[in-house]
A protein has these predicted regions:
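An N-terminally biased module of ancient metal coordination in phosphate/nucleic-acid-related enzymes
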Residues: 1-78
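Mid-to-C-terminal alpha-helical segments outside catalytic/metal-binding sites
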Residues: 297-332
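A generic, well-ordered mixed alpha/beta core segment in the N-terminal half of proteins
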Residues: 77-123, 127
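Active-site mouth loops of central-metabolism enzymes
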Residues: 22-37, 81-91, 153-158, 181
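Histidine/acidic residue-rich metal-binding segments in metalloenzymes
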Residues: 4-17, 40-44, 64-69, 94-108, ...
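Short acidic/histidine-rich active-site segments
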Residues: 231, 277-296
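Active-site beta-loop-alpha junctions enriched in small/polar residues
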Residues: 25-27, 59, 82-88, 113-117, ...
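Hydrophobic faces of well-ordered beta-strands that scaffold small-molecule active sites
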Residues: 18-24, 54-56, 80-83, 108-112, ...
Length: 332
């Protein structure tokens, strides 16, 4: 493939102007897995690069509280947050959702779990003596105390009461988007279909699902109105290195996203999928913030630069980093 004309360092920086990173992990975090920067630093760096907004993700806290504070001290910039339904919040917990809706700046998203989905937690583990072993096999305590508390989405039949209540809460607050979280592709398909049934207008298929789903499954979800998320972190050097992403117990260090050998595929594959799905159906972000990666602004610039090298036009990139995130966030 001939490299496209016009690609340059300057162009990748120019395309940050007005951009939105919908997946930023800023501090604080657990001692054994510090963050690269704090939320105020993240906002200041994004603003100084000309970006329009960032969305904070936090596996332990309602990040809309963080957004409320940052918005008070960083002028001329917007940050958003929401709730990830991990076990620290009781998993499938309608009370947590009710609270998040009215807390701080108000939740902008509700995610159905990250490391606390059964699909991911059951597959998290690390290589021991040359063989991948799930944490649930290494530590019976993990299975009893963590795995059994994790979120599962029934793929058929009526939603259980807690899921029904949460979907009703999201539907009643149209400023909030549903984030599938790190569920299985089958569970994500079910959530997208349920969103349509409940009248939920904004849905994001999390990048953890995007890495696992087939192209046909992604096409189905996009055809039903969901945005498909691609994040650069899934394709970096740090992904297959065990870390304490969520659990404070150091023995629970695991490979990111629960992949037996780390995330498979490449950024080229992601680019091919975006082309096939259509950039109008996709959003890119970084999922950066971990201390082994660059700061999120640089991560987004690198993602943009790679897409330019892979033949995406500046207009396509603007769809992915500006127009579509604005639509998801209801920014007009």
């Amino acid at each position: 493939m001939l490299l496209p004309e016009g690609r340059s360092l300057e162009l990748s920086k120019e395309l940050l102007v007005g951009a939105i990173d919908i997946h930023v992990h800023a501090g604080p975090h657990i001692f054994s897995s510090p963050r690269r920067l704090d939320p105020i630093e993240a906002a200041l760096q994004a603003r100084d690069a000309g970006m329009k907004a960032i969305v904070f993700m936090d596996v332990f806290e309602m990040s809309n509280g963080t957004a409320w504070l940052v918005n008070r001290v960083v002028p001329d910039f917007l940050t958003y947050g929401g709730l990830i339904l991990n076990t620290v919040y009781g998993g499938m917990n309608p009370r947590a959702v009710k609270t998040a809706i009215q807390y701080g700046a108000g939740a902008k998203y509700i995610s159905f779990g990250a490391h606390s989905t059964y699909y991911q937690a059951a597959r998290e583990g690390r290589v021991v003596e040359g063989k991948f072993v799930p944490l649930s096999e290494l530590y019976p305590k993990f299975r009893a105390e963590e795995l059994e508390r994790c979120i599962r989405i029934p793929v058929d039949g009526p939603p259980p009461p807690e899921l029904d209540e949460i979907l009703q809460l999201i539907a009643a607050n149209p400023d909030i988007y549903l984030n599938t979280g790190h569920v299985s592709p089958a569970e994500a398909l079910r959530l997208v279909d349920l969103a349509g049934e409940y009248g939920i207008g904004r849905v994001l298929v999390a990048s953890a699902v995007t890495k696992e789903a087939s192209l046909e499954e992604l096409q189905h979800m996009a055809a039903n109105g969901a945005f498909i998320e691609y994040t650069l972190a899934a394709y970096t050097h740090t992904t297959p290195i065990p870390k304490t992403h969520y659990y404070v117990e150091r023995e629970y260090a695991s490979i990111d996203e629960g992949m037996d050998l780390g995330q498979t595929g490449s950024l080229r594959l992601a680019a091919e999928q975006i082309r096939t799905l259509g950039p109008e159906h996709c959003i890119i972000g970084t999922d950066f913030g971990v201390y082994t990666l660059p700061e999120p602004v640089e991560g987004l610039r690198e993602f943009i630069a790679c897409l330019l090298d892979l033949g995406f036009s500046p207009d396509d990139v603007r769809l992915l980093v500006k127009t579509n995130p604005e639509r998801l966030l209801g920014m007009g």
